[in-house]
Amino acid sequence: MGKSLEWADLDYELQPWIKKAINVSGFDSMTPVQASTIPMFAKNKDVVVESVTGSGKTIAFVIPILEKIISEGINNSKFKKGHFYSLILAPTRELSMQIQNVVSSFLEHYPEDQYPIRSQLVVGTNEKSVRDDVNTLLDERPQILIGTPGRVLDFLQSPSVKTSSCGMVVLDEADRLLDVSFFKDVEKILNVLPKQRRTGLFSATISSAGTLIFKTGLRNPVKITVNSQGKNAPTTLNLFYSVMKPEEKLQNLIHIMNNIRFKKCIVYFSTCVSVTFFYQYLKYLQQTDKTLREDLQVISIHGKLTTQSRRKALSTFTESLSDCILLTTDVAARGIDIPDVDLVLQIDPPTDADIFLHRCGRTGRANKIGRAIVFLNEGREEDYIPFMEVKNVDIEETDINKNKISNDNNDEFYQRFTKWLLSDRANYDLSVKSYVAFIRYYSKHSATSIFRLQSLDYVSLGKMYGLFRLPRMPEITKYLQDKEKSGETVVGYYGEGWLMNPPPIDMDKYAYQDKKREKARIEELKNLAQINDKKKLKAELKKKNMAWSSKTMTKEERQERRKKLDLKRKAIELEIAAEAERDESDTEITQDWKDEILQKKKKKKVGSEMQGSFDDL
């Protein structure tokens, strides 16, 4: 018989104000992971929790922390200044802020007549320094700290911050916190905390952390795994894939945005610069070209934005009442809980298979229906589907690209794209940066048997970014050379990097709309022209005097060789002379040595003759 999911059936009584917070939030019953985790974590057990995305893991550790603060009597004025009771670590600022919001939503119902329970956010921002965070700890005396590893480590290194009262630690998205980019900081943080503490690790893919989980100071942990019928994705989440050429991806994205109904959609790109580039182009299509519906709100967020910008963008997306689309990177892939996200699109699969689940998990949360679609390039990338099946993730093909885009429509779309690029050289520069960044990203894919640079269609990929001329890159040079050797024709490539014939513009006359940038470009062009003339003159002089130069070099080489031979000859003569002197002084020893060898030879000869005579007997 399964564990009861009724809040009333917990084996201990929840605080009345926590019950009220649960009721106000609309959590009528517990999720399976909450029913399994809350009793364990609240009763002095270390836990390692693996559960599908959107299953309520945050509540599963927030309630035990609040309960323990009450039961341990931490909510009183005697709690020491500069101390804290619990620490929650998360890999991103966005997830940290979300956890802070969940804690705050519970504390809104905390009795005003009792000593307050407070939480503090400790994340890197341009607005606050580490010193400011320390002052907040000293002034407000929060019992709960929530933050990212880098900032928390700097924070804990302050002599004013005392760690001896820390009784509970949570690693949310633990597999990410234990990978190479965070592990050193996390390890240092855990080393300065008391060993006698409760530790909880939470993630949808904790198994990928392997043996590293044992380096977190766990003591007799309880492993809690909650899957949906043996699958690694919730049953309310429908996973789809669509196979197409790279150049068709953007056109399909716009088709979905214009024709498929959704409230909120998250679109994942590979790199920060790609988010910026496609955001600018989509805004152009919406405001100028009028081919993207005007009632759709388009927002972007990525890791290179300031904390304030990221926070504002995420808040706008979360609170928007109109149809809304968020262009982002994996910065918004883990743990972020945004209501009403009913569609997730991945323009390319992530480098890590675990990230695929985290991306998809932004929809289909809290038993709501969600759809997630990943775009795959034609060819080798189609093997990604059986690859994910091995990881218990079933993905069905969707008919979004069933009616293949006609060449005429594709050409028309591409020409409209290049028209935007041609309007300002800055657009082209951003396109090139996005293209190059994607190739670098692709080269670092963990599933190298599927995602190989040798199999990438560089020309079609260039058209996806609107490029009319490919940049010079070793990868592209090798790609073209391999095609030439095999006798294959590269469709859509017209030599010297051009993807359009005739070339749509003279690159020397390709201008920036920004006057300062254009002036700097013209100056640089003049300087390069002078340098190029000098190089050309030097090349011609070298060509004219090539035979003479060769002869001169040969003559010099001969002279140098003679000098070396003379020196070598003299060195040999000196060595011979020295040997002769040694021979004269050691004549007797040498003679004795020769005599000894002769005697040995004679003995061998006699022995051989004697052996022969014995054989004759």
UniProtKB/Swiss-Prot annotation:
Protein's organism: Candida glabrata (strain ATCC 2001 / BCRC 20586 / JCM 3761 / NBRC 0622 / NRRL Y-65 / CBS 138) (Yeast)
Gene Ontology molecular functions: ATP binding; ATP hydrolysis activity; RNA binding; RNA helicase activity
Name of the protein this chain belongs to: ATP-dependent rRNA helicase SPB4
Domain Helicase C-terminal intervals: 252-406
Short motif Q motif, span: 7-35
UniProt EC number: 3.6.4.13
Record text about domains: The Q motif is unique to and characteristic of the DEAD box family of RNA helicases and controls ATP binding and hydrolysis.
Family statement: Belongs to the DEAD box helicase family. DDX55/SPB4 subfamily.
Positions contributing to ATP binding: S51, V52, T53, G54, S55, G56, K57, T58
UniProt catalytic activity: ATP + H2O = ADP + phosphate + H(+)
Domain Helicase ATP-binding: 38-224
Domain of life: Eukaryota
Subcellular locations according to the entry: Nucleus, Nucleolus
Subunit structure: Component of pre-60S ribosomal complexes.
Motif (DEAD box): 172-175
PROSITE patterns reported for this sequence: DEAD_ATP_HELICASE, HELICASE_ATP_BIND_1, HELICASE_CTER, Q_MOTIF
GO biological process: assembly of large subunit precursor of preribosome; maturation of LSU-rRNA
One Pfam family matching this protein: DEAD
